[in-house]
């Protein structure tokens, strides 16, 4: 019997894109991209709720990188913003604020 894994379309915000592009640590970028790739296949890995519906993807590298995202059905995931453990509370507030103003179409 064939098995079909779910796939999710990943979308990003300009805030996430700017944060990711500005990361100086190439190893961190590769690890974060690998986690995003796994997320697109339905495997979120290490995560924690950041207050429904925002989810915090935890990357155990360097200062403890975080990527905040929201899932919409089985179709796509929006990466809202990123940061690290030192900016965690501000990043969670920013993710919720972005979500309130995000066009989910």
Where are these regions (language model features)?
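Enriched for short, Lys/Arg-rich terminal
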Residues: 1-9, 18, 26-29, 44, ...
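PIN/NYN-family metal-dependent endoribonuclease catalytic core
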Residues: 13
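A short, surface-exposed loop/turn module that caps and links secondary-structure elements
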Residues: 34-61
């Amino acid at each position: 019997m064939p098995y079909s894994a779910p796939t999710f379309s990943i979308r990003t915000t300009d805030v996430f894109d700017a944060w990711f592009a500005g990361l100086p640590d190439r190893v961190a970028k590769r690890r974060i991209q690998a986690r995003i790739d796994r997320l697109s296949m339905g495997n979120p890995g290490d995560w924690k709720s950041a207050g429904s519906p925002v989810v915090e993807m935890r990357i155990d590298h360097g200062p403890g990188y975080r990527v905040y995202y929201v899932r919409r059905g089985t179709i796509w995931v929006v990466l809202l913003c990123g940061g690290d453990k030192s900016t965690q509370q501000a990043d969670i507030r920013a993710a919720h604020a972005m979500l309130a103003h995000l066009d989910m179409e």
